[in-house]
Amino acid sequence: KYPSHGERFTGEPAYFRHVRMASERLFADTDTLARDYTWAVFHQPNGKFPAAIAAKLGFTLEQTAPGLLAPRIGNTYSGAVLLGLCNILDAASPGDTIFLCGYGSGAGADAFSMTVTKNILGYDRSDAEKLETRLADTTEVDYATYAKYRGKLVMGGGE
C-alpha cells in the first residue's frame, strides 16, 4: 500500500548521492554552476530533500521555490519534476535557463539543462489554467473523510 525503501539503495543516502553526482556532472559537462540558472527543480519525495540538495549545490530559494511543490501537494513520485517544470514554464521568459534533476529510487539520477526560447511567446497560454491556479482550487477534507477514501477505515457489518 505504501512505498518501501531497499536500505542503502534507496531513500536518503541514495537520493543525495545520485542527485549530487548527476548535478555535478552536468555542471562539469556544461561549464555551469548553480548561479548560471534562472530556475531549478529537483525530484521531490518530500520538501526537505530537494531544499537541502539545492542549497548544497549553491541554488537559492528564489531559483527553487516555484518548482518545489511537495510541501504543498505531497510526493507525486515520477510526476514531481514535471509538475515543478510546468509551474516554472508558466512564468518563464525567453532566455531563462532551467536546471532539472530527476531521481528514481536506487536507479540513479539524471540532470538536464534547458534554455527557454522565444518560441514560448507564440503559445496561447490562455487555453489552460496555470498550475498555481489549479493548486489554489482545493477542497479541504477532515481526517475521517480522507481515511475513508484511502481505505484506512472499513465499515463493519454490524455483527
Residue spans of the language-model regions?
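Short, contiguous, pocket-lining structural segments
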Residues: 7-19, 32, 41-49
